[in-house]
Amino acid sequence: MHKVLVAIDGSEHSGRVVQYVIGLIQDGGLLGGSVEVHLVNVQSFLPTRIAQAMDSDELTRYYDGKSAEEAQKAIALLKQQRIAFTFHTLRGDVASKIVAHSKSLGCDSIIMGSHGSGFLEGIFLGSVAAKVIQLSTIPITLVK
């Protein structure tokens, strides 16, 4: 069974990533056959001042709500195509969490967008993508 971590952030690139994964699975390509999809959204920590003003339940609701919002389109696409997946919400440094979670799940590959929703989108290779490439020891597919 091929385990793939699909990293999404709610950006336009995330939609393309999910469409790419769907195509790989349905067309019997690289992921054809037996595949386990792990859809991952990582929320960066709020600034300390803001986080300290919130209690634990408020923080959990904030992170979970933001993650669900960012994953909504990706989840709908996968469900529409009847592709089984597990959704994971993580918190912290995005690139580090993606790589660490791929290791803990025993993933064979990571598929993610080449850019996210950052300020300089489209100008440079996204900083998260560049860091994941640097940290990961498994194959990574970047979707433009």
Stretch-by-stretch model annotation:
Residues 38-40, 86-90, 141:
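General small-molecule cofactor/ligand-binding pocket signal
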Residues 57-69:
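A short acidic, glycine-rich active-site loop
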Residues 76-110:
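Structural beta-alpha unit
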Residues 135-144:
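Short, flexible loop segments at boundaries between secondary-structure elements
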